[in-house]
Amino acid sequence: GLKPDSEYRYETLIDGELVKSETALRVRTYPREGQASAFRMGLGGCAGYTPIYERMWSTVASHDLDAMLMLGDNVYLDLPEMAGAFHDYTYYRRQSNPDFRKLVASTPMYSIWDDHDAVIDDIWMGRYRDKPDWKQPMVNLFNRNWVNPGEGVTEWPGCWYSFSIGDVE
């Protein structure tokens, strides 16, 4: 396996073909669980798409973070009944940004949702798992676009989970 607190370089292959990258792709493993260690974590949220501000991702990446926690409103969908191409495009637009791609290629990303990731805060965990009709498709969309270590529990899909970096949980 990988050694703790070590940097590794990696390549991406699609159908056996090397995908070229503008920068060297790297990943740094966390310190051994329970081991005290300094680390850098970024916190972000309310990341609506405004083209002139999308350069912010390169500013965030310049801090060489060990992890980034996105605290919701990661994209602004706000129209849950229009699930489909509009929502896919909203994520595609963000994820195709070169500065964002560089950040996520080298920084572990953790995310939770808030109202703009769908709409109406209380609907996410309201009384009904599958109502309104758009609720489960929005949960599925979020999970397709964020590789989190957990998705709630079977009875109530969600975006809560825990993770550790060294001696911090």
Feature-to-residue mapping (PLM):
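Metal-dependent phosphoester/phosphodiester hydrolase catalytic core
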Residues: 1-169
